A protein has these predicted regions:
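Hydrophobic structural segments
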Residues: 1-119
Length: 119
């Protein structure tokens, strides 16, 4: 399905989505830090997020300093997949808040552009 007009085909990036995997015990503190940095606003709503439980696995290698477990031992731990949005201009603040509040030595996170039509 193609665009019917040039105007309908124009999009802009004004927000991004952060997806991060957080241990169950750290969900609230990470959310609080992200919200304080400006994440979680959608229209007239604040503190917007979505999370679902899952199981994370990892094996800390030599030279790692794992928060949970020991080097050389594979671990499985209950985690949440946490998603929230933020304005692009706050990306540095949001990522800094994530890294400072997340308990893992190497937090796993993704940043996605959210395209919005120009109207």
């Amino acid at each position: 399905m193609g665009c019917t007009s040039e105007r309908a085909c124009k999009v802009r990036v004004v927000r991004r989505k952060l997806v991060v995997f957080v241990p169950v015990s750290a969900l609230e503190s990470v959310c609080e830090a992200l919200f304080a940095a400006g994440a979680g606003h959608i229209g007239g709503y604040e503190r917007c997020a979505w999370y679902t439980p899952g199981m994370g696995t990892f094996l800390a290698g030599e030279g790692a300093a794992p928060t949970i477990g020991e080097v050389g031992q594979e671990r499985r731990i209950g985690e949440y997949r946490l998603e929230t949005v933020y304005p692009t201009e706050l990306e540095a603040d949001v990522v800094r808040a994530l890294l400072e509040s997340h308990p893992y030595e190497e937090p796993v996170f993704d940043l996605y552009e959210l395209l919005e039509p120009e109207v």
